[in-house]
Amino acid sequence: MKLTDKQINAIKEEYAQWKDKMYADNSVSRRKDFGQFFTPPELSIKMLEKFENTEGTILDPCCGAGNLLAAAIKAGFDPTKVYGIEIDEDILNIAQSRLVPLGVPCANIHLGDALNPNSYDF
């Protein structure tokens, strides 16, 4: 699947807006403490171009500010089948504020540590 130039530009614009806020609000040491490494929009787009079927469900276990999930929606995934988990509540709030206007239910973006098997009972 190829994204249109309009979709690519929208993803880049969203990324630039939240990146400025995120870096202003979060120190380098805090990002290191949480192991935060954000996926650039260009990489999110390249990853999603590999999907031939947008009928499924997407789960990003370390969704950050939602770059990959926003790109998935713009690529044609159903927003109600997009899920994210984020350990940092401040970054989670950014993800929710970006994804809810795109149609993702707020309840689909969870606060939690998806890398810790003891965090969930499923």
Q: Residues of each region from the PLM?
A:
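SAM-dependent methyltransferase catalytic region
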Residues: M1-F122
